[in-house]
C-alpha cells in the first residue's frame, strides 16, 4: 500500500515558521493571494481550498491550515475540500472549520467512503456539509474498502434522504509526475476499475 504522510514528514518551511509563531498568518496570506491573484505569478487561480488531516488525529500543524482556510473562505467564498485519511476525523474537521467561521454549505469532507458506517457519515452530514464518496475503484490499498461496501453505505444514506449532500468521484490520477506506478498483477486486477468511467458504468446502475 502507499505510505501515509504525516505532518512530521513534511518539508521544513512551515514547521520552521510554526516555531517562530508566524506560520498560520503566512498560510492565510498564501491561500488568499493564490485565490485572488493566482499561483506563483501564473494568473491561474485555484477552484478550492484543499486541507488535510492525518489518520485518527488532526495535528497542531494541520490545525493551522484549517484555521487559515476557514478565515480565507469567509473573505473569498471559496469552497473548502478536505482530505480524510481512511475516512477518519470527518466530524472533527467539520467542527474545527465551523468553529473558525467557515460556511458549512461550502465545505466538502473528502474520502469519506474510507469509512463504511452510515451512522458515522451522518455525524458529518448533519452538520450541514457535503461529503465526497470519491474513491470508487480504489480497493484494498491505502486502507480503502471494496466498492461493494461503499455502495451499501451509499444506499443507506440515499434511503435516509442525504442525496443532495453526497458527491461521487474516483480520485483518479490523470497525469503522473514521474513514472506511473507498476502494480503487482493481483493489485492491478483489484484496481482495474480505477478510471473515470467506472461510476457511470458500474456504480450508478446499482443505485
What is each PLM-predicted segment?
Residues 1, 34-44, 71-74, 98-101, ...:
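Acidic (Asp/Glu)-rich catalytic clusters
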Residues 194-207:
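Mid-to-C-terminal alpha-helical segments outside catalytic/metal-binding sites
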Residues 2-7:
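Short, small-residue-biased leader/transition segments that mark boundaries at the very start
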Residues 1, 20-33:
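Glycine-rich anion/phosphate-binding loops
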Residues 109-115, 135-159:
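Active-site glycine- and acidic-residue-rich loops that bind
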Residues 9-11, 53-55, 86-88, 113-116, ...:
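Active-site-proximal loop/turn and secondary-structure-junction residues that shape catalytic pockets
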Residues 38-115:
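Divalent metal-binding pocket/active-site signature
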Residues 80, 133-135, 163-185:
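Short acidic/histidine-rich active-site segments
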Amino acid at each position: 500500500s502507499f505510505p501515509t504522510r504525516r505532518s512530521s514528514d513534511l518539508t521544513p518551511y512551515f514547521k520552521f515558521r510554526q516555531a517562530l509563531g508566524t506560520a498560520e498568518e503566512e498560510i492565510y496570506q498564501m491561500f488568499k493571494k493564490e485565490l485572488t491573484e493566482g499561483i506563483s505569478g501564473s494568473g491561474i487561480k485555484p477552484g478550492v481550498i484543499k486541507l488535510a488531516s492525518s489518520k485518527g488525529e488532526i495535528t497542531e500543524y494541520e490545525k493551522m491550515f484549517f484555521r487559515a482556510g476557514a478565515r480565507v473562505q469567509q473573505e473569498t467564498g471559496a469552497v473548502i475540500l478536505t482530505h480524510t485519511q481512511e475516512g477518519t476525523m470527518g466530524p472533527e474537521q467539520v467542527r474545527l472549520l465551523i468553529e473558525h467561521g467557515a460556511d458549512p454549505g461550502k465545505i466538502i469532507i473528502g474520502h469519506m467512503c474510507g469509512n463504511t458506517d452510515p451512522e458515522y457519515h451522518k455525524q458529518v452530514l448533519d452538520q450541514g456539509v457535503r461529503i465526497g464518496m470519491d474513491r470508487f475503484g480504489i480497493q484494498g490499498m491505502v486502507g480503502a474498502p471494496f466498492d461493494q461496501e461503499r455502495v451499501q453505505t451509499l444506499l443507506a444514506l440515499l434511503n435516509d434522504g442525504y442525496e443532495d449532500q453526497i458527491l461521487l468521484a474516483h480520485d483518479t490520477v490523470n497525469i503522473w509526475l514521474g513514472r506511473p506506478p507498476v502494480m503487482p498483477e493481483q493489485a492491478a486486477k483489484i484496481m482495474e476499475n480505477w478510471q473515470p468511467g467506472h461510476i457511470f458504468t458500474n456504480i450508478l446502475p446499482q443505485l
